[in-house]
């Protein structure tokens, strides 16, 4: 069975982090902190890296399911002038915005490194290099498309991601009128 375990995440200019590295335990990780300290940001960065896995599928995973870095995810730096007579406002987006990953991938626990990056405003998320998962995923897709049971050994990973944003959606509330 092919395993995918993220060992290390490195964030460069991603949301509130200028340059931060997180080493993850293969069994379980707990992020605890005050509101706004970056707990969700680390999980969203892991989701961007899972997007690299999903992006490797060309046939069976629509691109709308691939989570990318957005322009709004780029760290903002306040403009500050050395001259006290000059008033500055606003922020400047800090590019490049990059998420790097070291992970175990495959049946032989091979270590892979890859990164996803956005280089300028309104640009698309790119791979910094090639996607090391793509050859394996292409082989899986070919086996599945044959429909001759040659895919019997393929065990696809289950990927589940629930964002905290789901807590704030009002779409499922039904208005009831009494009286």
Give the predicted meaning of each segment.
Residues 1-179:
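P-loop NTPase switch/coupling surface
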């Amino acid at each position: 069975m092919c395993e995918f375990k993220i060992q290390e995440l490195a964030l460069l200019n991603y949301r509130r982090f200028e340059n931060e590295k997180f080493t993850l335990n293969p069994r379980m990780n707990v992020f605890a902190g005050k509101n706004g300290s970056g707990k969700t940001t680390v999980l969203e960065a892991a989701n961007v890296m899972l997007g690299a896995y999903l992006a490797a599928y060309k046939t069976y995973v629509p691109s709308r399911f691939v989570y990318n870095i957005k322009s709004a995810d780029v760290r903002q730096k306040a403009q500050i002038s050395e001259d006290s007579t000059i008033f500055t406002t606003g922020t400047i987006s800090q590019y490049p915005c990059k998420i790097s990953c070291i992970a175990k991938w495959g049946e032989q626990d091979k270590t892979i490194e890859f990164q996803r990056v956005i280089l300028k405003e309104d640009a698309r998320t790119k791979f910094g290099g090639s996607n090391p998962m793509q050859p394996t995923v292409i082989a899986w897709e070919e086996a599945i498309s044959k429909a001759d049971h040659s895919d019997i050994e393929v065990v696809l990973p289950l990927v589940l991601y629930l964002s905290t944003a789901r807590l704030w959606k009002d779409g499922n509330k039904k208005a009831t009128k009494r009286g």
